[in-house]
């Protein structure tokens, strides 16, 4: 069972080393889940003397005002033999055998965190391990003494600051409260009892300790309290007799003080019947045993919590991405990998693995054909317009057989209007591709880390799409112009021939251009234009896909990659200027993950179920 307390000690030290102090944080905390015994009391309650009595050594700083300004995690390790010594976690290679030096180091380490002349407090704990054959395996957290008034230039908030710190420790359900109260004061005014009652109203995890029993007024005693009648707790009260200030000034050692404490209870008529559960030695053994039981009961839940938290931290760490490489080659490789991830996401949208690419089909199947249908060819082929163009094309010499030049002008005037829908189709596909670029940007988690790289890649991709759009527009309009530039003669040769096709040259020009004749010309032209439109409905989508979609899949970032290989280290670093908040978050999560994995390994190595 002793290994269980050692296990918690080890995890507590790891928590402090890796920045988990249990205070409010956006990261999960393991510290708050560990069973601990917090020592709570007013500044004049005898709290320090109780701790020194349990340890059997003088090692705590003393003085007026607030002496304890940081939590002291006191880990006691029982050894079979050898000289007593102490170790601080912040000085791992140094053993202290002089406990006066331990006292000084506690003061110095407190000043390093809070400032030498400062009166402020800090939640960052000091870890002190004491190895001795005269102690039990136990961990105690010494907290600053509660006070009611700020003195000696202390900030006005110090009273509330201390109370908030103490409360933040003892309100946790895994915290065992050791409430120190002086017997020579009314228990109703006890700072320790007052605050412990607020967080543990039923007294289920509070141990009461009465100090200064030997200093009570003559004719009074603490029997009612010690027997649970004055203030009832789940666990029995423990009375202790500490060294007086005169004893401390005379350097009375702890062995003599413990002997005198035993003699006091054994010879006292009031407390003789309670001797077996009184005194600092009994207090230490009782707390050690209780802590072992609590730790064992918490281990299964702690394991589940650790496993769940490791999974959550790993997921977030993966989402945040890898840290930036230090060398130019590593940076270049990172950028290339991120760009490839983006490019792959973009291709998946086009290929149908992701949504969005189907909108291009909608342009070809719906938007483009509908735009052609909306072209008002009937206006171009109205009776007046046909007569006008035919007449203008004939010039001063009327046509002999068929008005070929008139036909050409009519067809050209219709086909030129197709340029509008063709350009609109090019622009519509361009707009869809740009939307897919922005969508792919948002879906490429790595790009979220690097705002500058995101802007550069987005700009390069859009520039490529713009170039492809321009090429596509040229190719698409060329298809339309080709239809205008060379007509399919065979179409007209297959048209039904009429005797009136050319008219009688001897008739007047107005007789020759009668309504029936002009209607036939308009009908023939419309049939030809419809044939051309049917062909363009097939060829224009092919041109757009070839020039825009296919090229976007094949070479979207080619120019960016070429320029990237020529960039210097400083410019590569600028592209990877990750948000400092993300960097800090990744570092914090990595440390916290290290803590949880270490705790998981430590727990699995302990045969706690035996």
Swiss-Prot record:
Nucleotide-binding among keywords: yes
Q: Which Gene3D superfamilies match?
A: Dynamin, middle domain (1.20.120.1240), P-loop containing nucleotide triphosphate hydrolases (3.40.50.300)
Pfam families the UniProt entry points to: Dynamin_M, Dynamin_N, GED
Region described as G5 motif: 241-244
Q: Region G4 motif: start and end of each range?
A: 211-214
Region described as G3 motif: 142-145
Catalytic activity of the protein? GTP + H2O = GDP + phosphate + H(+)
What residues does GTP bind to? 44-49, 212-217, 242-245
PROSITE patterns of this UniProt entry?
Answer: G_DYNAMIN_1, G_DYNAMIN_2, GED
Instruction: Outline the segment boundaries, as ranges, of region: G2 motif.
Output: 67-69
Q: GO CC terms for this protein?
A: cytoplasm; cytoskeleton; microtubule; phragmoplast
Enzyme Commission number, as recorded: 3.6.5.-
Carrying N-acetylmethionine, the residues are 1
| Entry keyword set | Acetylation, Cytoplasm, Cytoskeleton, GTP-binding, Hydrolase, Microtubule, Motor protein, Nucleotide-binding
The UniProt entry, under SMART domains, shows: DYNc, GED
Would I find Nucleotide-binding among this entry's keywords? Answer: yes
Q: Which PANTHER family match?
A: DYNAMIN, PHRAGMOPLASTIN DRP1B
Q: What does this protein do?
A: Microtubule-associated force-producing protein that is targeted to at the leading edges of the forming cell plate during cytokinesis. Has a GTPase activity.
Could you identify this protein by its name?
A: Phragmoplastin DRP1B
From what organism does this protein derive? Arabidopsis thaliana
Give the lineage.
Eukaryota, Viridiplantae, Streptophyta, Embryophyta, Tracheophyta
The gene behind this protein is DRP1B
